[in-house]
Each structure stands twice: as C-alpha cells, then as structure tokens.
Amino acid sequence: MKVLLLTGLGALFFAYYWDDNFDPASLQGARVLLTGASAGVGEELAYHYARLGSHLVLTAHTEALLQKVVGNCRKLGAPKVFYIAADMASPEAPESVVQFALDKLGGLDYLVLNHIGGVPAGTRARTPQATRWLMQVNFLSYVQLTSRALPSLTDSKGSLVVVSSLLGRVPTSFSTPYSAAKFALDSFFGSLRRELDVQDVNVAITMCVLGLRDRASAAEAVRGVTRVKAAPGPKAALAVIRGGATRAAGVFYPWRFHLLCLLRRWLPRPRAWFIRQDLNVTAAAAA
C-alpha cells in the first residue's frame, strides 16, 4: 500500500512539473534583485534571467566573483545588469542593497533570496556569537530585505522567491543552528503569505526547497558527512525560476524532496530511516 501511495504521488508531481504554464516571455524586462549571485545556484539563476531578458541587480559577498557573473550576464543578453557587493552578516547591508536596486531599476518585480552562510556539516555553532551570525545571514537578513522591498513589490504585484533547503522542512542530524535558521524562514514566509492574503496584497511568495548546493563550498562543508549528491545547478535554478514566474507556492528540487516532507508527517519512522542512510554518522560525530 505504501509503495502504491508513493508511486501515485510521484506521478502527480511529475504531471505538475510538466504542466506549470511557464511563459518565458513573462520575464522579459522584469526587474530582479538576486542575492547570493556569485556562485552555484545563484550564478545559474543570474544566467537564466539574463537569457530571458530580465533587468538585474546582483549581490553577493565577493566583488571579484560578482564582476565575472555580471560580465557573463551581459554576454548572454541582459539589457541591464548592476551589482553591489554586500556582507549579509552586517545588519546595515540588506537595506542598502534594496535601496541600490530601487535606484538602479526604478522598482522591483522579483526579489530572489538565495544567499547562505553556514558551518561545516557535523559541527555546531559553539558560541552564542556564532549562532547569532548564522541567524543574521540565513534568517534576519531575509526578513530585512523583504521588509524593505515589500512596498515596491506591492506596487508591481510582484513576487518573493525564497531559496531554502530541505533542512528547513525536515530536521536532520549535525546541522542544528543552520536547520533552525531554515525552519525560521519557512515559518516567517508562511505566515507572511497568510497576512498578505487576508490584506488582499497581490504579492506571491514561492518557497523553494533544494538539496545540496552544486558549489565547491557546499561540497567541502559536507565532505565525509553525507552521501547525498549535489543537484545540478542549472536545472535547480530553472526550477526556481519556473516556480517564481508561475507564482507557485512551493518548488521542490529534486521532486522527491516533496515526498520526504510528506513522510515527515505521515510516516515518521521511514523518514528517519531515509535520512540516516544519507549520513556518515561516525564522521559527523567526530567533527
């Protein structure tokens, strides 16, 4: 019975992803602020938006990497592309980034929140200061960016696209503070969606649940701890863009993560078993 149930759910998810009414032309001329744009999924998001003719403001921590991405976006046909280097660990950075984007683009149609800050898997934030840093980068900066951009998104009937993680839906071992920040994101934006709805504010919120990021820093952080393979950056980025453009409530990539999230509620014991299979417990505990 369980196998039949999972098979049926899988068929439904495939049908959904193949029929999402995505119109690439809807992104031509769209004004997009993208964070975490210098590498991995964020870099691929920038390239997809550039190909689709969006106007871009890109931000990340490292200016040299941003400059490379900006140059590539221009080659791919982005009509406008600007960048601002910013450290989201600084409480002042989010507001200055949004103001820069508003000044350059005259408003926003999409705010795509993708930046992350973490610690190596298997370690814990061993001090209150380290935990505060994690929460500032992975949660509070998202709140600040959203609060500052929301008036413009309200005017444009725009979209908030939040790139999160499976760790924000399903608790797992050896990622306590990072997972806490991701759960906070899910709760905050879920509540905000309800508030906007009851106030008849036409701003969509798309929560994107992705797997391991396809970038060197992510691979190094989980080396020896997890057996999970990174999701291909271009494919994950395209799933995020499709979800945002169609104003979907949620995106799961790979799609099986949706099943794992459902297992959390319906079948907690199998869910725990699946998670354990992906962990090298000995290596993580020794970290």
From Swiss-Prot:
The active site is at Y178 (proton acceptor). The keyword NADP applies. It is found in: Secreted. NADP(+) binds at residues 36-62, 87-88, 114-116, 178-182, 211-217. InterPro entries: 11-beta-HSD, NAD(P)-bd_dom_sf, Sc_DH/Rdtase_CS, SDR_fam. It comes from the Eukaryota. Gene3D superfamilies: NAD(P)-binding Rossmann-like Domain. Its EC number is 1.1.1.-. Keywords: NADP, Oxidoreductase, Secreted, Signal. GO terms for cellular component: extracellular region; intracellular membrane-bounded organelle. Substrate binds at S165. It catalyses: cortisone + NADPH + H(+) = cortisol + NADP(+). Residues 1-15 form the signal peptide. Pfam families: adh_short. It is an enzyme of class 1 (oxidoreductase). GO terms for molecular function: oxidoreductase activity. Belongs to the short-chain dehydrogenases/reductases (SDR) family. Unidirectional NADP(+)-dependent cortisol dehydrogenase (in vitro). This is Hydroxysteroid 11-beta-dehydrogenase 1-like protein. It comes from Macaca fascicularis. The gene is HSD11B1L.
